[in-house]
Amino acid sequence: MLSKQIPLGIYEKALPAGECWLERLRLAKTLGFDFVEMSVDETDERLSRLDWSREQRLALVNAIVETGVRVPSMCLSAHRRFPLGSEDDAVRAQGLEIMRKAIQFAQDVGIRVIQLAGYDVYYQEANNETRRRFRDGLKESVEMASRAQVTLAMEIMDYPLMNSISKALGYAHYLNNPWFQLYPDIGNLSAWDNDVQMELQAGIGHIVAVHVKDTKPGVFKNVPFGEGVVDFERCFETLKQSGYCGPYLIEMWSETAEDPAAEVAKARDWVKARMAKAGMVEAA
């Protein structure tokens, strides 16, 4: 029988770096997490995962089976370097090839959701043409994802193009495809001048997962939980009351910390305490 408890996961970059997924999933299990979200970022090291051999992919699947800790989602931030909105045709083609490989990888290892970065371009100047190319790139990507039965989900970003659920819903309506949904980050959502609770309510029916982190205006990473502007309890209450029953993912970048496991355990306890206050989990 499937568990009715709320799935709580941890971001790969919160845990010690390395390529041994069996060790990573064992640690996540020890720390009490249900799943780990894989990162495929713009570094050559993590991009190379998309070229893993059949044996390497099977090793990941076997690690999931052995530990019981799932890897249901991928954070695909590689498109910062190879954006779908690039005016350089070669760069844009690389971006689409990364998307194709990511979808194939997801299909092979059982990843259900690929979180997309909502940048038309990142290191270049945006304009109407970059936005048009980005829209067209998303359309092509969703067609590939549909055939593979893999969901593409747009993150709410640290970037004006996609800094609210309302804006992301515009793309969902434009694409009009069940394999394109939303993956909001309540930290990013709170760092902008958004009515956060109204935005979360607007996204219900399209939200497939939620990133949990703290932020400050203009500061989107490495803000310790409780030191930023996010009203976690209200966000959790709103999502619960709106009928959201999906996973929550604690997003941290503690892989280079002196003791990543201790940092993660501290964050886990803090987040679960706020979830308990919101009536989502039993108090420890």
Curated annotation (Swiss-Prot):
Organism: Escherichia coli (strain 55989 / EAEC)
Family the UniProt entry places it in: Belongs to the L-ribulose-5-phosphate 3-epimerase family.
Alphabetized PANTHER family for the sequence: ISOMERASE, L-RIBULOSE-5-PHOSPHATE 3-EPIMERASE ULAE
Organism phylogeny: Bacteria, Pseudomonadati, Pseudomonadota, Gammaproteobacteria, Enterobacterales
Biological-process GO terms, alphabetical: L-ascorbic acid catabolic process
Enzyme Commission number(s) from the entry: 5.1.3.22
Listed pathway(s): Cofactor degradation; L-ascorbate degradation; D-xylulose 5-phosphate from L-ascorbate: step 3/4
Keyword terms of this UniProt record: Isomerase
Induction: Induced by L-ascorbate. Repressed by UlaR.
Record's protein name: L-ribulose-5-phosphate 3-epimerase UlaE
Disulphide bridges: none
Protein function: Catalyzes the isomerization of L-xylulose-5-phosphate to L-ribulose-5-phosphate. Is involved in the anaerobic L-ascorbate utilization.
Gene: ulaE
GO molecular function terms listed in the Swiss-Prot or TrEMBL record: intramolecular oxidoreductase activity, interconverting aldoses and ketoses; L-ribulose-5-phosphate 3-epimerase activity
Catalytic activity from the UniProt record: L-ribulose 5-phosphate = L-xylulose 5-phosphate
